[in-house]
Amino acid sequence: MALSLTNFRIEPVDGMLALLPNQPILQGCQVSSAQPTALNAGDIVTIDGTNAKQGIITVKKAAVTDTPLGIVLTDPIKTSFAALDRVSVIPVNCYCYKTANANITAGSKLQFTAEGKVAATSTASNGYIGIALTNATAADQLIIVQVQPGMEPAAAAA
């Protein structure tokens, strides 16, 4: 997070909560032991049922074909989370900032890219992360997303 020295506003970053200060967060999730790279704020994660431990929500970075659980929350102290680290996840019905991969119109249903950016696409059998609440007029702009994870239905057989 960047604090402006002239007007004392916090600059938004990918994976930071937006709009409501008291949103529920999934605290104490654990990064899967099978996660090959560290997770970062803003990464989209899914549940790892294969490597789960009893009573602990175990997460890994979501592939575009996974149904996501939520988004890794920005942490002002720790910037990345390795395997077996504890991590907080922004779940369904919360609002956060995400980086757009291209132009996005508010109201669009959002899928995500392998890089973790949001995209206004509807590719069959791919996961989606939520709804755009603000516009992006170019790639790499931050938008506000209402987290609504799910899966785009498979294409109908002809």
Feature roles, as predicted:
Residues 1-158:
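Surface-exposed, low-hydrophobicity beta-strand/loop segments enriched in small/polar/acidic residues
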